[in-house]
C-alpha cells in the first residue's frame, strides 16, 4: 500500500526482515533506503547479531538520508538483560533537500509497517545518535 503523502511502497522484504530481527534476533540492525525510481522503501544493509553499534553507525552514509532499526541490548540497574528496538531517522544536513523531504514525508507511514519499535530517534549529525544518546533513551 502506498503512502498517500509521498507515494512510497514498503517492500515485503523490509517487513519480513524486521520481523526476523524482532522475533528471531537474526540481525542486530537493518538500514533502509528509499529507491526514488521504484517509489519504494527497501533494505540497504543487514547487520549480523555480533555486529556492534559502531559497525551500525559506520554502515549509514554520511551525506544521504536513511531509516534504520537497531536492536539494543542492555542490563537494567536490577541486573536484568533487556533489549529495545530503536527506529532512527537519519537526515544529515549535507543531504539533498528533495531527499530530506521525501524521507520526512514517508517516515510515519513506514514506521507503522514496523510493529514493535520502542524508541524513535531523529538525527541530523552523528552526535545525535551516539551510543550515549541510545543508552540515555532506554530508560525513558
UniProtKB/Swiss-Prot annotation:
Residues 7-139 form the ADF-H domain. Keywords: Actin-binding, Cytoplasm, Cytoskeleton, Phosphoprotein. The modification Phosphoserine is found at residue 6. InterPro entries: ADF-H, ADF-H/Gelsolin-like_dom_sf, ADF/Cofilin. GO terms for cellular component: actin cytoskeleton; cytoplasm. GO terms for biological process: actin filament depolymerization. It holds the Pfam family Cofilin_ADF. CDD domains: ADF_cofilin_like. Its main location: cytoplasm. It is found in: Cytoplasm, Cytoskeleton. GO terms for molecular function: actin binding. It comes from the Eukaryota. Belongs to the actin-binding proteins ADF family. Actin-depolymerizing protein. Severs actin filaments (F-actin) and binds to actin monomers. This is Actin-depolymerizing factor 10. The gene is ADF10.
Amino acid at each position: 500500500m502506498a503512502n498517500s503523502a509521498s507515494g512510497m511502497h514498503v517492500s515485503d522484504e523490509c517487513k519480513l526482515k524486521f520481523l526476523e530481527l524482532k522475533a528471531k534476533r537474526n540481525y542486530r540492525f537493518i538500514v533502509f533506503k528509499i529507491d526514488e525510481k521504484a517509489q519504494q522503501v527497501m533494505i540497504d544493509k543487514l547487520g549480523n547479531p555480533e555486529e556492534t553499534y559502531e559497525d551500525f553507525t559506520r554502515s549509514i552514509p554520511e551525506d544521504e538520508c536513511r531509516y534504520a532499526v537497531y536492536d539494543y541490548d542492555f542490563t537494567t540497574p536490577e541486573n536484568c538483560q533487556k533489549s529495545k528496538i530503536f527506529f532512527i531517522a537519519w537526515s544529515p544536513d549535507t543531504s539533498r533537500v528533495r531527499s530530506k523531504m521525501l524521507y520526512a514525508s514517508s517516515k510515519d507511514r513506514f514506521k507503522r509497517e514496523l510493529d514493535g519499535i520502542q524508541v524513535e530517534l531523529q538525527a541530523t549529525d552523528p552526535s545525535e545518535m551516539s551510543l550515549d544518546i541510545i543508552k540515555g533513551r532506554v530508560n525513558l
